[in-house]
Amino acid sequence: MDIIKGSPVLQVQNINVTYGNFKAVRDVSFDVKAGEIFGLLGPNGAGKTSTLSAVEGLVKYDAGTITIAGFDNRKEPLNARANMGVQLQSTSFQTELKVQEILKLYSGICGVDLNKQRLQQLLADIGLEDSAHKKYGELSGGQQQRVSLAIATIHEPVLIMLDEPTTGLDPQSRRQLWERIEGMREKGHGVLLTTHSMEEAEAVCDRIAIIDHGRVIAIETPEIMIEKHKGDAEVIAASRKGKVTLEDVFIGLTGKALRN
């Protein structure tokens, strides 16, 4: 990975995604920078996963452009894909395989020489230094998700994509996974994650895009978003006699609550 921190690793410009007569993504634009965690925050069905799928090249988009590390993902899909890491679902792996066997398998798929030093570094990055010889099925749900994170970073991509990475985890496992995601930022990766958790968005994201009905409504840091849109949320905050929160802003902009 050789990219300057703060430079864009992903640029999404005016894309539309349509399934039959249903437009799932409508004129969406945003970018993700190296060393940044960017969150797509919205309820189920808002268009988050469809947007990620368009970036990954799994679904066609009707208009607009998507570039990853400068490569157009339609014109140069192989180069774009080589610069992208995707967190796989925990059900993607055989439970009888050992952790190191899974990592070696995917390093081979990615064309990466996973020597002993690199293997130990990957395990250290996800806090599983002592679990190399454990079977995947013996790991907790949070540990399994961390193995998926290691696979996403195994070829040192500039962009890492995480689709609701902590869904189904208990609070402690969620916090542990957030620490690992923040570690990706420190290493200079650009991270694009989707979430319907307000807590997750505020805990790990440098910038947030609120998305609803396939449209991006606002993009800011959590703090600036609260300040800029507090006028839309002051009545909601006053009703519970508290300060304006990001959730108040979300309700003010979309007209609906977002539950974790």
Feature locations, PLM:
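Conserved ABC ATPase signature
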Residues: 135-139
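Conserved ABC ATPase "signature" region
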Residues: 104, 108-131
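Conserved catalytic motifs of ABC-family nucleotide-binding domains
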Residues: 156
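ABC ATPase "signature
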Residues: 219-220
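Conserved ABC transporter NBD signature motif
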Residues: 64-72, 79-80
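Catalytic Walker B motif of ABC-type/P-loop ATPase nucleotide-binding domains
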Residues: 160-163
